């Protein structure tokens, strides 16, 4: 199965506007949450309060951001753009 197929299935199943949480796992570094918020605000304006949780050894950080997407293109774009942020390992 390809990413394009996954996006096509997701697009069929979703209804908009849709409340979603993006969870991003990355290397623990100063400014990670702020960098992620800047990306989200570029595509969906609003005030966001990220929830952060560090790994037990402090190596990794997970950041959750709640959004309301107006269309599937916003969702697809955020998955791709959040993955490009320095230190990001995974976007869920």
From Swiss-Prot:
Pfam families: DUF493 (PF04359). It comes from Haemophilus influenzae (strain ATCC 51907 / DSM 11121 / KW20 / Rd). One of its GO terms (cellular component) is cytosol. This is UPF0250 protein HI_0028. Belongs to the UPF0250 family.
């Amino acid at each position: 199965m390809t990413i394009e197929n996954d996006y096509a299935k997701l697009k069929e199943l979703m209804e908009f506007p849709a409340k979603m949480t993006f969870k991003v796992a990355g290397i623990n570094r100063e400014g990670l949450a702020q960098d992620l918020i800047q990306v989200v605000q570029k595509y969906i304006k609003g005030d966001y309060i990220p929830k952060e949780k560090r790994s037990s050894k402090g190596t990794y950080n997970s950041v959750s951001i709640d959004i309301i997407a107006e269309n599937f293109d916003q969702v697809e774009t955020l998955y791709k753009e959040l993955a490009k942020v320095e230190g990001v390992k995974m976007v869920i």
